[in-house]
Amino acid sequence: MKKIILFHLLCLLSSCSGQDKKTEVKNEQIKAEKRFDIKRFNENKKNGKYIYTDSLGNQVTEITTKRGYGRYVSLKNEFNVKFLYHFYSTGILKEEGKVFDGGGFRIGTWNFYDEKGILTKSIDYDKPFEKHPLEKVLAYMKSRKAELLGMYTRIYRKIDEKGVPMWYISWDAHQRTKEDCITMVNIEIDAQKGEIVKEYHSFFWEYNNPYDKVPAPVIIFDKTKK
C-alpha cells in the first residue's frame, strides 16, 4: 500500500513539474528572441554601416542610432517593403515590424519590448485600412498606368483630423505643360468607404526656375467639399 501511495505522489510531482516547464516556455515566448550582435557589427562596419545578404537572399543594413542600433532588411519577395528592428544600446530588441519603403509608413503588426526584452504591446497598423488595404491601392495605380517605382511617385496614408483613414497617392502623368512643368496626378482615397474623394493635378519645375510662376493646381473633382 505504501508503494502505491509513493508511486502516486511521484506521478503528481512529475505532473506539476511538467506544468511548471510549460508555464516557463509560455512566458519565455513573450521575450524578444533577437539580439543585436554588437561585436560582429563593430568588426565589420564601414562608414558606420554593416551591409550583407542574409540566408534568404535579403539585403541587410545595420547601423548605429541615437539610442542604440538598427537593422533594416529589404525583403526581396515583397514590393518596396523593409523589415525594421530597433535595438537598445545593450543589443536587446526594442521594436520590430514592417514599413512600406515607398511612403515610409508602418504596415502590419509591430511588437514593442522593454529593456529586458519583454513584450509590452503590439499594434496592428493595417487595421484602420483593412477595408481598403495597400494591395487595392497598388492595383488601382496599375490600372491608371502609374509607375509604382517612378521618381516622383508617392504613396502615403494617415488618419486625418476627422478620424478617417486616408490614402494619398501621386505620380508623374508624363505630360508637360506649355511652361514645361511636370504634371502630377494626385488622388485621395477614403479607406473606410474605399472611395476616391478627390483628384487634382499639380505642377512643378523639374529644375528651379525663378523667372516663371508655376501653374495653379487643377481640380478634377472634389467630394470633400459640400
Ranges and model annotations:
Residues 16-226:
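Glycine/tyrosine- and acidic-biased, solvent-exposed loop/turn segments at the edges of beta-strands
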